[in-house]
Amino acid sequence: MNTEEHRTPVVWRPQHRQAEFMRRPEPEALYGGAAGGGKSDALVIEALRQVDIPHYRALILRKTYPQLSDLVDKSQMYYRRAFPQAQYNATAHVWNFPSGAKIYFGSMQYTKDRTNYQGKAYDFIGFDELTHFEWEEYSYMMSRNRPTGPGTRVYMRATTNPGGIGHGWVKARFITPAPPGTPIVEEYTVRRPDGTEQKLQRARVFIPSSIFDNPALLQNDPGYLASLAAMPEAEKQALLYGSWDSFSGQVFTEWRNDPAHYQDQRWTHVIAPFAIPKHWQIYRGFDFGFSKPFSVGWYAADEEGRLYRIKELYGCTGRPNEGLRIDPVEQAQRIREAEQNDPVLRGRVIHGVADPAIFDESRGESIAAMMERSPNFLHWKPGDHTRLAGKMQFHYRLNFDADGRPMLQVFNTCKHFIRTLPNLVYDESNVEDIDTRQEDHIYDECRYVLMENPISPPARRTALPPPDDPLDLHRQARFYRI
């Protein structure tokens, strides 16, 4: 017998970084960062891992159904060659395998669409372009990720590029906590029916990829690398280099956080804390939240009108965009305690400005009135809620002058401001405003303070200083038009 004639053909062979992603044991893994790393191929193939098990069920998701077409095309190319007897039902969007296993393709255009999966169970769930999803959608599907029968491995996988409505929570969950390839382990406490507590752990990991991890693409399309390099700077940083700090759709592209300049306060919006002079005016901004986080920020104004965010109180559980569910009186108590316990704020005259919605009396006593009662005595002034004007005040203040000084700077202790502001993206429908589905509570609270202290547009936008170039490579570079 000629073994060459009967050798099984190779349908798909993973490249190095794809193989690294596919061999990870963690229940959650994110693959991606830059464009061209072969992310979608790896996700489509990973779903095949258990199709020999009759009761195996898998689900691959994109935000909208039209976006699924590329994934379905990939499945048509790979699945039919690997399993000639497998059949795709275009009406139900499901692959049926000879064993009885099924791989579904689904979408979740709106958060309410998650109920379409209520009561379902999937051994494998894959998200393509995870940053297009909100945390509530992803976390809900974690509850659908459960065994459909004995012997299956239960896990979730996702791929993505930076940018999108979910950029902030994806970055916070997978990118920030640990270096790439390092397991992120969280511990949870569960109270059992008998009253005892059980400690549980769950791990996740981020595996980066880029076009440089996909030699097959570089060989087949040498011009693709040049196409990425020619993109606008924000898109190039995200799609070519996988930067999570600069991406398409980012609202405040001016934002800079440079620890090298925390002390001299030049060319950075984040600075080291310093003593606040007694004569500087102090403002307190407030955005109420119950199921979503509430936000309080304290600002000091210097003689030039520059604002410094010197302290913050952010009412979140630690999960993305999830509030503490505490009432206005308790929020007022926490704000008052924060001011009494802070030597910079204690005894100061503080001007409070808040979301005008807290003055609404249509359903009884207003939130503002509750917070002003004894013993907290917090007084608020209704803030100017003009959204686009407020957004422009952000742009004006984030602009650097010729000396590298902006008109808004933030103490590096204000972690939630630093985390959320650069992640804000534009609304796809109202393209001049930010998308309000995001974690925008700090942005809103700060906006009220900025509108209380409006400044004129800067005479001109100042370019950032050139990057450090000790080898003089940038100056010596030559660019040719082809």
PLM region descriptions:
Residues 1-27:
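Pre-P-loop entry segment of helicase/translocase ATPase cores
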Residues 40-54:
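Walker A/P-loop NTP-binding motif
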Residues 56-68:
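Conserved RecA-like ASCE P-loop NTPase motor core of nucleic-acid helicases/translocases
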Residues 66-123:
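Inter-Walker segment of RecA-like/P-loop motor cores
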Residues 132-214:
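ASCE P-loop NTPase helicase motor core
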Residues 213-286:
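ATPase catalytic-site recognition across NTP-hydrolyzing enzymes
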Residues 297, 305-438, 454-482:
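Mg2+-dependent endonuclease catalytic cores in nucleic-acid-processing enzymes, primarily RNase H-like
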